[in-house]
């Protein structure tokens, strides 16, 4: 790597600088999620069909032995995540989990560099608790908030 590349990596991952388009935040989130799943394949902007037949474009998907293990979304810019955002996230995760390719899906992670509104967190927790608690339907919903140069993850 040349000096420019090393300086850019330092700005993104050490200094945690932000850029207008939110790309640096996305890189940090992708690196964070990939670090949670060792020996797994990390796929970016993956199209995954749900039970509904709709193809969902997932920003980051984790595969192990050809099966999806986790999906993750991140909001890098704009306003804090609201209840409508988490409802859409839940619907996508539920549709993928219920589909042919989601049978081994265990985690759905919603990351944010702009925060979560209180009603959004409550809404996602309620949706998560409304799921059947059997092994076939189990899906862990997690939020990852990036603040003070670190991610804090909360299971909903």
Outline where the language-model segments fall.
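Hydrophobic beta-strand residues in large extracellular and virion-surface proteins
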Residues: 29, 33, 42, 59-62, ...
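Extended low-polarity, hydrophobic cluster-rich segments
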Residues: 24-34, 70-72, 105-108, 146, ...
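Catalytic cores of nucleic-acid endonucleases
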Residues: 67-145
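Active-site metal-binding core of divalent-cation-utilizing nuclease and nuclease-like domains
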Residues: 40-65
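Phosphate/oxyanion-binding active-site loops and adjacent basic polyanion-contact surfaces
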Residues: 21-26, 53, 81-86
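Acidic-basic catalytic patches of nuclease active cores, encompassing PD-(D/E)XK
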Residues: 2-49
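Surface-exposed interaction regions that form or flank ligand-binding interfaces
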Residues: 1-13, 139-156
